[in-house]
A protein has these predicted regions:
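C-terminal substrate-binding/catalytic lobe of Rossmann-fold NAD(P)-dependent dehydrogenases
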Residues: 14-21, 30-174
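Rossmann-fold NAD(P)-binding glycine/threonine-rich loop
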Residues: 1-20
């Protein structure tokens, strides 16, 4: 339920579970939407788009474009190489579309529970099968980005049978 990051922290505090075992959906669904839209934009299979939506799920989430890759090529380099075809304004529109997608789905269907359910199933499968898969789940940061341990936000992390096993800190540059 939303606000997912706050509810994840409340769950952590009320249960007393190890922080690695308390995982919220975070921006997992937003990241999947982002990759899908980037795949359409760059005309490539979305599985080869490596980009993340991070931060608090909702209006303040963002895409660190400096870390976005199309296969092995940085997205920002592609924009620079093909300025007549690809534009930063288009990426900003895609980012905004991802941020507001839930509102559009709720307006049309009344809720977003199918997408969320699929994302939860995918995370549970990663835990049960000890997959070491990367998700932008809502997890407690451990000092990453200079933030205190009390903060739960959507951030790339490796999830396996131990839970959110490792937080992957992105280099955030202008």
């Amino acid at each position: 339920t939303n606000p997912v990051d706050i509810m994840t922290r409340v769950t952590y505090e009320l249960t007393g579970f190890n922080a690695a075992k308390v995982i919220g959906i975070g921006t997992t669904l937003d990241t999947a939407r982002l990759r899908y839209l980037l795949g359409q934009y760059f005309e490539i299979d979305p599985r080869h788009m490596h980009a993340y939506v991070i931060g608090e799920h909702g209006d303040s989430e963002f895409v660190p474009w400096s870390q976005a890759m199309m296969a092995v090529n940085p997205v920002l380099d592609i924009l620079e190489k093909y300025p007549d075809r690809y534009k930063m304004d288009d990426l900003d529109r895609i980012s905004n579309d991802v941020r507001t997608a839930a509102y559009e789905i709720i307006k049309a269907k009344g809720s977003t529970y199918y997408g969320i359910g699929m994302a939860v199933c995918r995370i549970v499968r990663a835990i049960f099968n000890n997959e070491n898969s990367v998700f932008t789940a809502s997890v407690r940061l451990r000092g990453e980005y200079g933030l205190r341990n009390e903060v739960f936000i959507g951030n790339p992390c490796i999830i396996n049978s131990g839970g959110a096993n490792r937080i992957l800190e992105l280099s955030l540059t202008g």
